[in-house]
């Protein structure tokens, strides 16, 4: 169910769908979206469920596990909602779940997707502070503050989702006969554009800037220390930032363009046909995070020697981060002692 859905007479005259709905023919973008949804569902549910299981036992004693637990929960819940999108696309975007479900289910999908983005930005900021302000982290960084930061991320994600919940409605069509579920701003283009701009800035630009700035400074700090200079660090940085940018950019750009275009324009109609594919592309980010941190954090031989839960526990817990923080703390203290 596209979040930037517009109702107009063009929806009622779709030449690709017969009146009796007997044809199983789907557009190529919809077929590609279904394939992506299927892969993301299988990988995302299993991968994030494993991460939740591993980090749930560690969250009481390690802050890093709190970050990844919340991130995995957001991605896991997003993946669980995929059969809903899958069913709607298979039925030529017919919505068989009713009006209440039209408001709640797509809004929950958006809530979890934006929570995933904001939590990823929070994790990046935390790693930045660990490296550049380790003394403050040792004095004030605790589980309570981590849970508060996660609550703020979830709260902001909820605010970003409210417009979708308020303006999402169902509409019955007759040629072909089907029910559509989408966002209807009542032809108020200013409100629609304002919602799109706020969502773009808070849900994409700001997290992207946070990721880019944090990992750029972390990369510079790492490369300035000759003992830790390696191409692996560069690959981790490129993977995290590039995956976020690549998978979310089409969804955000098409949504912004559709909010500024007239529903009858050829460009709008083309973007509307690609909307499901853009959503599925953004969904890849829900299953890619566990893969990035596991594959980038360990060598191939190490992955073969360890069981997957054990490997995830080593990657997602606090040990390596704490050691890095303590190392910088000792270095800072030694430097201060030499100056006095």
Swiss-Prot record:
<feature type="topological domain" description="Extracellular">
    <location>
        <begin position="1"/>
        <end position="30"/>
    </location>
</feature>
<protein>
    <recommendedName>
        <fullName>C5a anaphylatoxin chemotactic receptor 1</fullName>
    </recommendedName>
</protein>
<dbReference type="GO" id="GO:0045177">
    <property type="term" value="C:apical part of cell"/>
</dbReference>
<dbReference type="GO" id="GO:0007204">
    <property type="term" value="P:positive regulation of cytosolic calcium ion concentration"/>
</dbReference>
<keyword id="KW-1015">Disulfide bond</keyword>
<dbReference type="GO" id="GO:0006954">
    <property type="term" value="P:inflammatory response"/>
</dbReference>
<feature type="modified residue" description="Phosphoserine">
    <location>
        <position position="320"/>
    </location>
</feature>
<feature type="topological domain" description="Extracellular">
    <location>
        <begin position="87"/>
        <end position="103"/>
    </location>
</feature>
<feature type="disulfide bond">
    <location>
        <begin position="102"/>
        <end position="181"/>
    </location>
</feature>
<keyword id="KW-0968">Cytoplasmic vesicle</keyword>
<feature type="modified residue" description="Sulfotyrosine">
    <location>
        <position position="4"/>
    </location>
</feature>
<feature type="topological domain" description="Cytoplasmic">
    <location>
        <begin position="220"/>
        <end position="235"/>
    </location>
</feature>
<feature type="modified residue" description="Phosphoserine">
    <location>
        <position position="325"/>
    </location>
</feature>
<feature type="transmembrane region" description="Helical; Name=1">
    <location>
        <begin position="31"/>
        <end position="57"/>
    </location>
</feature>
<dbReference type="GO" id="GO:0031410">
    <property type="term" value="C:cytoplasmic vesicle"/>
</dbReference>
<comment type="function">
    <text>Receptor for the chemotactic and inflammatory peptide anaphylatoxin C5a. The ligand interacts with at least two sites on the receptor: a high-affinity site on the extracellular N-terminus, and a second site in the transmembrane region which activates downstream signaling events. Receptor activation stimulates chemotaxis, granule enzyme release, intracellular calcium release and superoxide anion production.</text>
</comment>
<feature type="transmembrane region" description="Helical; Name=6">
    <location>
        <begin position="236"/>
        <end position="258"/>
    </location>
</feature>
<dbReference type="GO" id="GO:0042789">
    <property type="term" value="P:mRNA transcription by RNA polymerase II"/>
</dbReference>
<feature type="modified residue" description="Phosphoserine">
    <location>
        <position position="331"/>
    </location>
</feature>
<feature type="transmembrane region" description="Helical; Name=3">
    <location>
        <begin position="104"/>
        <end position="125"/>
    </location>
</feature>
<feature type="topological domain" description="Cytoplasmic">
    <location>
        <begin position="126"/>
        <end position="146"/>
    </location>
</feature>
<feature type="transmembrane region" description="Helical; Name=4">
    <location>
        <begin position="147"/>
        <end position="167"/>
    </location>
</feature>
<feature type="region of interest" description="Required for CHIPS binding">
    <location>
        <begin position="3"/>
        <end position="11"/>
    </location>
</feature>
<keyword id="KW-1003">Cell membrane</keyword>
<keyword id="KW-0807">Transducer</keyword>
<dbReference type="InterPro" id="IPR017452">
    <property type="entry name" value="GPCR_Rhodpsn_7TM"/>
</dbReference>
<dbReference type="GO" id="GO:0016323">
    <property type="term" value="C:basolateral plasma membrane"/>
</dbReference>
<dbReference type="GO" id="GO:0007200">
    <property type="term" value="P:phospholipase C-activating G protein-coupled receptor signaling pathway"/>
</dbReference>
<keyword id="KW-0812">Transmembrane</keyword>
<feature type="modified residue" description="Phosphoserine">
    <location>
        <position position="310"/>
    </location>
</feature>
<keyword id="KW-0472">Membrane</keyword>
<keyword id="KW-0297">G-protein coupled receptor</keyword>
<feature type="topological domain" description="Extracellular">
    <location>
        <begin position="168"/>
        <end position="193"/>
    </location>
</feature>
<keyword id="KW-0145">Chemotaxis</keyword>
<keyword id="KW-0765">Sulfation</keyword>
<feature type="modified residue" description="Sulfotyrosine">
    <location>
        <position position="7"/>
    </location>
</feature>
<feature type="topological domain" description="Cytoplasmic">
    <location>
        <begin position="297"/>
        <end position="340"/>
    </location>
</feature>
<feature type="transmembrane region" description="Helical; Name=2">
    <location>
        <begin position="63"/>
        <end position="86"/>
    </location>
</feature>
<feature type="topological domain" description="Extracellular">
    <location>
        <begin position="259"/>
        <end position="275"/>
    </location>
</feature>
<dbReference type="GO" id="GO:0050679">
    <property type="term" value="P:positive regulation of epithelial cell proliferation"/>
</dbReference>
<dbReference type="GO" id="GO:0004930">
    <property type="term" value="F:G protein-coupled receptor activity"/>
</dbReference>
<dbReference type="GO" id="GO:0070374">
    <property type="term" value="P:positive regulation of ERK1 and ERK2 cascade"/>
</dbReference>
């Amino acid at each position: 169910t596209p979040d930037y859905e517009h109702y107009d007479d063009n929806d009622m005259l779709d030449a690709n769908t017969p009146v009796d709905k007997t044809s199983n023919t789907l557009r190529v973008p919809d077929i590609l979206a279904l394939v992506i949804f299927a892969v993301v569902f299988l990988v995302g549910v299993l991968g994030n469920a494993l991460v939740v299981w591993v980090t749930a036992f560690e969250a009481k004693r390690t802050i890093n596990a709190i970050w990844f637990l919340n991130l995995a929960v957001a991605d896991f819940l997003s993946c669980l909602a995929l059969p809903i999108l899958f069913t709607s696309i298979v039925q030529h975007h017919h919505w068989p779940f009713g009006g209440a479900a039209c408001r709640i289910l797509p809004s929950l999908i958006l809530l979890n997707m934006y929570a995933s983005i904001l939590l990823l930005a929070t994790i990046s900021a935390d790693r930045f502070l660990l490296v550049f302000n380790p003394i403050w982290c040792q004095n004030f960084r605790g589980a309570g503050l981590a849970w508060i930061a996660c609550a703020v991320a979830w709260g902001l994600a909820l605010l970003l989702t409210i417009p979708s919940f308020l303006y999402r409605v169902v509409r019955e069509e007759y040629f072909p006969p089907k029910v559509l579920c989408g966002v209807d701003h009542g032809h108020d283009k200013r409100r629609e554009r304002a919602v799109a701009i706020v969502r773009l800035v808070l849900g994409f630009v700001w997290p992207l800037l946070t990721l880019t700035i944090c990992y750029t400074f972390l990369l510079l700090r790492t490369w300035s220390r000759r003992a830790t200079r390696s191409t692996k660090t560069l690959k981790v940085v490129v993977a995290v930032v590039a995956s976020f940018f690549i998978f979310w950019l089409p969804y955000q750009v098409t949504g912004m363009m559709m909010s500024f275009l007239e529903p009858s324009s050829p460009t709008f109609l083309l973007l509307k046909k690609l909307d499901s594919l853009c959503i599925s592309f953004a969904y890849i980010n829900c299953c890619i995070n566990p893969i990035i941190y596991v594959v980038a954090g360990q060598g191939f031989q190490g992955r073969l020697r360890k069981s997957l839960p054990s490997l995830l526990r080593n990657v997602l817990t606090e040990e390596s981060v704490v050691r890095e923080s303590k190392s910088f703390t000792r270095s800072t203290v030694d430097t201060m002692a030499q100056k006095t």
